[in-house]
Amino acid sequence: MSKFVVVVFPNETRAYEGSRALKDLHVDGSLFLYGMAVIAKDAAGNVKVKESVDPGPLGTAVGVLLGGLVGVIGGPAGVVAGAAGGTVLGSLFDIVNLGVGEDYVTKVSEELGPGKTAIIAEVDENWTTPLDTRMGALNGTVLRTWRSDFEDDQIAKEVAAEEADFEALKAEYAQATAEAKANLKAKLDQAKADLKQADARLQARIDELNNEMDVRLAAQEKQMATAQAEAKEKIKKRMAAIRADYTARTAKLKQAWQLTKEALAA
């Protein structure tokens, strides 16, 4: 499972030195850098994007986190300061979908004071020392959080609830009087339609995860091709961890998908 990293620096110059150091760590195989962006907070407390994340599948999550953080802590009226506007709440929802907790957002907001600049990145790392050492030498403060499978858990829970509703309605319909069945038929048909949509949503998410895993593994393979022997061993371990993580995530969804298939076939 990868991590989101926010590194806060006292000024923009240090941040760009930090971004070069982060790229160097990727080149030497100490970590894998999926995507990176740079933001700065001005004297008025407004956050501006100084360097946006590279487009493409590897940078997608960082792009979402970047947009979410800017939306939440991008000005004096952010969520951390107590506001609850629709745009801000939407940004917070995007962050939560990545598995990033509100406590982490608060830490970033508190650390990123006026005049400071931060790197936002998604990385895979075997050890924390290489990144901490390089960033610490530039007076950077490293804040880490795991990227979790919150979205997958939520999908599985929603599908389980829809399946339970469908099974309950089927049981009620089977024992209902003729008059009651007429009223229940529309509900049962709607529940079945909802379950079919859930089935399609599960399959689409499973395909999405499989594609994402393939892209990440291919990128790691590319990094390993130019790495030194010691770094290659680290990369192999990261690749094994990626496979294990995605296998576990898809297994939960496949289990839910199988249950929907059985419910619809019954």
What positions do the PLM features span?
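Short, low-complexity, glycine-enriched hydrophobic/amphipathic alpha-helices that associate
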Residues: 53-99
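Membrane-engaging insertion elements
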Residues: 84-124
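Short, extreme N-terminal segment that most often corresponds to the first beta-strand
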Residues: 2-11
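A generic local secondary-structure boundary/capping motif
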Residues: 25-28, 107-110, 132
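Heptad-repeat coiled-coil alpha-helices
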Residues: 166, 170-266
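Envelope-exposed proteins and targeting segments
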Residues: 3, 34, 115-117
